[in-house]
Design a protein with these regions (language model features):
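Polyanion-engaging groove/track-forming segments
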Residues: 1-1022
């Protein structure tokens, strides 16, 4: 028996399924029920529903359509292998071997041109994968083409643009048969399957006792026919989720009809009457625009002429959402014949929030807004639980970081449990990401950021006996040794670059090892500038870093060689053993990599492909396979579900939320391959990603029981310019405005305002916390900030701190206070230290020196020039990697060295026989102790390779006061690029008086911050 059931609600189909199972149990209690579903998510929902209704759900199989039909083929037909020799993977490897042999034929000229200069057969592998995918589609949707090609008919009317395809298919088929493999494939199996079922010569126990097909929105024509044929031997119940109670297989999207009208009437001799015979009424515009996938499926089912049962349930028009669902159910469009005025439109209650549209500035704001809206729904509806809410988006991986940031960091009192499905193992696992980075090293620049992303993976750190502190230490060494990119000169040559080693990993390691072995050195050692900051037990970390760099070098060298798959298995296993020390969870991930390699071995063995594989092919294969492996789905686990918009997610939820409904993003548009003959000759029922996405949106609209929530990026985060939503959102909004209105709404403005909420850029906008605003937020942590708005004067301290006794004073503390009084207060009294940011690592060698690097370079050159060692200093700078590579270093520093030499010539006469003076003064009973360096027979001298600034002169003034108060009658000089500045000698008593004023200021500065930076003070004094 083959029975079709139509219903607009999945709940009704579930109830029917329960009734059929409970009232008509299988004769053998140990035989499983078989329910065909399209996705694991649907299977999970159905298990929970069956268990809730029946008390238990056990001994039930939930196969997917392709796997079920193949198992049915093996049960009914003879000589059907467990794995088809015509599956996409087998076709790919077969084409890899056969296609190069065909390129000399005229028909293959386009492919021959494409495959020119194909190093390592990488382009061939990519092309064969695409051709195999196209052939696989032909087997399902154009089996008659395949049959004609195999019989020698090239179908020239169809293949005129791609005459190579029938030739290549015949060659491929003959090759597979020549290997002694089965001739069965999905193109010829269906006819054989139907014939075998009619003959009845097979073991009936291999088929399930009965079959339910549940929650599948579309199947290929031959799949449906195979199910009907199967119904001759077992009971097959095909449950169709049909959004409309009337036949709608012939309705047409009005916009599409308008385009057809224009093209039709532009042809000579064409009339409107002739067009009307070909195209029918468009019915409900939402159904006609978004329902092409379901419409084609309905058309296929109607052609079966099988018995049908209808189980439709009307929606109560208590809300806008239910009214729209009822319009679709009744194929109704009140505004189809005329524009409705306000009196003719259906009236909605003013508080209706069943359909919500939210405009945000960014994906993060979308998630933040969603969180507040969900909290409001949960507050308003006490019976609403997180498991009643599903949130879908075009790409869940793009939103996952924002979801975890907002939902994962919510405080306990407003925490909403959540789960994220549909992420791949690669997206969830840093270990797999690091493995793929290791695989990509042969064509990588091996930059510092890439390498450290590999090293900081916990399993890698464990392998090299490192922890987070040691990792940070290594980062500092890398930054100090100017490592930027590249293993060494040889690796750069392999990438077509000049053979230079500066700023490479080998360059930096040599500096570290030389520094550890030799210590501090004033000269180069064999052209190496030793880095002497590594000593003692840190040598172990240096050794681990060297071993890790050896691993990188091993990957770069061994991965670029072509090998048979067994050789690749050996090399990759070697990499895994050398790179990772896995824990229990990591071991599962590493086993996944090995399973993919074993899968590749099996595919090549099945295809009898024995040629060596290049690194590029292996990298692409492993990346694709690991990228398609799903992590734990965690779908329907009692929490808010985040998942990707994908087919058969039309599970009913009370609240359905759609994020990322942006123009150009959804519906997704994937252009067909240029050699896809199905795109040139389309038919009803052909799959299209854009049509699939339109139907997914319609399913989401129909599966929402209480609220449909839609958000999109409606404003630019850069300039606040408006952005339009997805065309599907616009169509829904337009439909609602044409057919519905709120009370007292005469121009649609009120309805639009009710449906669409535009949110501000920031979550702490005062619009969220203003009583008269319709916006709201549960994020009470923003309230203190908002309460301070308008308070122009914010007192950091209500009163000064209690003074601490000052028993003595170091000169260094007094100088630090003069340099930055506020910073000194925070450090001395509040114990707050403004440490500089972490190490900033660069991925490019220096091309142009930045301001800070230029100043540091000038200071080093000035110091060296004063000591008449400028040339040696320049050589060390080159050897340390601070300067650009090659002649650029000479050109960029030529004027700089000249200026430093001139300045040194001016300073040198003042510096002769330097002294270091100990100062011991008593200022107002407080001892002031310290040392003054750079004191010469004629003066105290300071210099800097920059213009003299206020902080320099204040520092010099304080040192000058200490010098004079200590009984020295000397001048104090400061040399800068803007000239020479000095202070004349002071009387000792006067200098002590000035120091007492500084001491008083110092005491005050320990009780409260003094807003008097040295630069500002010098400008005021000047």
């Amino acid at each position: 028996m083959f029975q079709i059931y139509h219903s607009n609600k999945l709940d009704l189909q579930k109830d029917l399924l329960v009734r059929l199972i409970s009232r008509h149990p299988l004769s053998d209690p140990f035989q499983p029920e078989t329910i065909l579903v399209q996705s694991p998510g649907m299977a999970q929902w159905l298990k929970l529903e069956l268990a809730d209704t029946l008390g238990i759900a056990a001994n039930i199989d939930f196969p997917l359509p392709a796997s079920f039909l193949w198992s049915s083929f093996t049960a009914v037909l003879e000589d059907v292998p467990a794995r088809s020799a015509f599956n996409k993977e087998a076709l790919t490897w077969g084409l890899m071997e056969l296609l190069p042999q065909q390129l000399s034929q005229t028909e293959f000229a386009p492919l021959q041109r494409y495959l020119e200069q194909d190093e390592g057969q990488y382009k061939l592998y990519q092309l064969c994968g695409k051709v195999a995918d196209i052939f696989d589609q032909y087997l399902v949707y154009r089996p008659e083409w395949i049959a004609s090609w195999e019989s020698g008919d090239d179908l020239p009317d169809i293949t005129a643009s791609q005459p190579w395809q029938p030739i290549l298919w015949r060659t491929l088929q003959q090759h597979i048969l020549g290997l002694g493999l089965s001739h069965w494939h999905r193109g010829n199996m269906f006819n054989g399957f139907v014939a075998a079922l009619n003959a009845g010569k097979f073991d009936h126990t291999e088929l399930p006792a009965r079959l339910f097909v549940f929650g599948i929105s579309a199947l290929p024509q031959n799949f449906v026919e195979a199910l009907q044929a199967l119904g001759q031997r077992i009971d097959v119940h095909l449950m169709v989720c049909n959004p409309c109670k009337y036949y709608w297989g012939d309705i047409v999207d009005p916009k599409y009809l308008a385009r057809i009208n224009q093209r039709w009437l532009s042809k000579p001799g064409m009339s409107v009457a002739a067009l009307a015979e070909s195209y029918h009424s468009h019915g409900n515009p939402l159904l006609s625009s978004m329902g092409k996938l379901g419409r084609d499926y309905l058309h296929q089912i109607q052609d079966l002429a099988a018995p049908e049962i209808e189980l439709f349930e009307d929606c109560e028009r208590t809300s806008l959402l239910q009214s729209v669902q009822q319009d679709i159910l009744e194929l109704d469009d009140p505004s189809s014949e005329r524009v409705l005025d306000a009196e003719q439109k259906r009236v909605l209650p003013a508080e209706d929030r069943s359909l919500q549209l939210h405009s945000a500035h960014s994906p993060l704001r979308e998630v933040e807004i969603l969180y507040d809206q969900l909290l409001a729904m949960l507050d308003e509806h006490a019976d609403l639980s997180p498991r009643d809410i599903i949130i879908m988006m075009p790409d869940v991986a793009a939103y996952a970081p924002y979801i975890e940031a907002v939902f994962g960091n919510a405080p306990f009192d407003r925490y909403i449990p959540f789960s994220i499905s549909d992420r791949t193992l690669q997206q969830e696992s840093p270990l797999l990401q690091s493995f793929l980075r290791l695989l990509g090293l042969p064509e990588s620049r091996v930059t510092v950021s890439e390498v450290l992303e590999i090293l900081e993976v916990p399993a890698v750190l464990r392998q090299f006996n490192l922890d987070s502190d040691r990792f940070e230490r290594i980062c500092r060494w890398i930054e100090a040794c100017q490592i930027r990119w590249g293993i060494d000169a040889d690796q750069r040559v392999r990438q077509g670059l000049p053979p230079f080693e500066q700023n490479s990993w080998r360059f930096g390691l040599r500096r570290m090892l030389a520094g550890f072995a030799m210590g501090q050195s004033d000269s180069l050692w064999h052209g190496i500038d030793p880095y002497a900051e590594i000593e003692g037990l840190e040598a172990e970390d240096l050794g681990q870093l060297a071993e890790f760099v050896e691993l990188l070098e091993f990957c770069c060298e061994r991965l670029q060689q072509e090998k048979p798959v067994a050789g690749w298995f050996e090399v990759i296993n070697d990499i895994l053993q050398r790179a990772y020390q896995p824990d229990e969870q990591d071991e599962i991930l590493l086993s996944q990599i090995r399973q993919v390699l074993e899968q590749l071995q099996q595919q090549l063995s099945d295809s009898h492909y024995q040629q060596p594989l290049s690194w590029a092919i292996m990298r692409d294969y492993l990346t694709a396979e690991l990228g398609s492996s799903r992590a734990s789905q965690r779908f329907m686990v009692g929490a808010v579900n985040f998942c990707t918009l994908m087919p058969m997610r039309s599970i009913p939820f009370r609240v359905v939320c759609l994020l990322g409904m942006n123009d150009g993003v959804y519906p997704r548009a994937i252009p067909p391959m240029g050699f896809d003959l199905m795109a040139e000759h389309p038919r009803r029922g052909d799959r299209s990603r854009r049509d699939d996405d339109r139907y997914l949106f319609l399913e989401a609209l129909l599966s929402a029981r209480q609220t449909l929530y839609i958000s999109y990026i409606g404003r630019s985060v850069q300039d606040n310019s408006p952005k339009v939503p997805s065309v599907l959102v616009s169509e829904l909004m337009e439909y609602c405005q044409q057919n519905y209105r709120l009370d007292s709404d005469s121009d649609n403005a009120t309805l639009q305002q009710q449906l669409l909420t535009e949110h501000p850029l920031q979550p702490f906008s005062d619009r969220y916390f203003t009583p008269e605003s319709s916006l709201f937020s549960y994020a009470e942590e923003w309230l203190p900030l908002l309460r301070q708005q308008g308070n122009t004067e914010q007192s950091f301290m209500t009163r000064p701190l209690v003074a601490e006794p000052l028993e003595d004073l170091e000169l260094t503390d007094l100088l630090a206070f003069a340099r930055n009084p506020v910073k000194h207060f925070f450090q001395r009294r509040l114990k707050v230290f403004f440490n500089s940011a972490g190490v900033e690592l660069q991925d490019e060698e220096p091309f142009q020196l930045d301001g800070l690097s230029l100043y540091q370079l000038k200071q080093q050159l000035l110091d060296a020039s004063i000591n008449e060692q400028q040339h040696q200093c320049f050589e060390r700078m080159v050897a340390s990697g601070q300067l650009p590579v090659g002649i650029a270093a000479e050109l960029q520093t030529r004027k700089l060295r000249h200026d430093c030499q001139e300045m040194a010539d001016k300073i040198r006469p003042y510096i002769n026989a330097p002294e270091r003076i100990e100062c011991q003064l008593i200022i107002a009973g407080i001892p002031l102790n310290g040392w003054l360096t750079g004191v010469y027979p004629g003066a105290l001298v300071r210099y800097r390779a920059a213009n003299a600034k206020g902080r320099d002169m204040v520092q010099l003034w304080l040192e000058h006061l200490v010098l004079c108060a200590s009984g020295y009658r000397l001048q104090s000089y400061f040399f800068g690029l803007n000239g020479r500045h000095w202070f004349d000698p002071l009387e000792q008593g006067r200098a002590l008086d000035y120091l007492q004023e500084w001491l008083n200021a110092y005491r005050q500065g320990l009780c409260e911050p003094l807003p008097l930076p040295a630069d500002t003070a010098w400008i005021l004094e000047s």
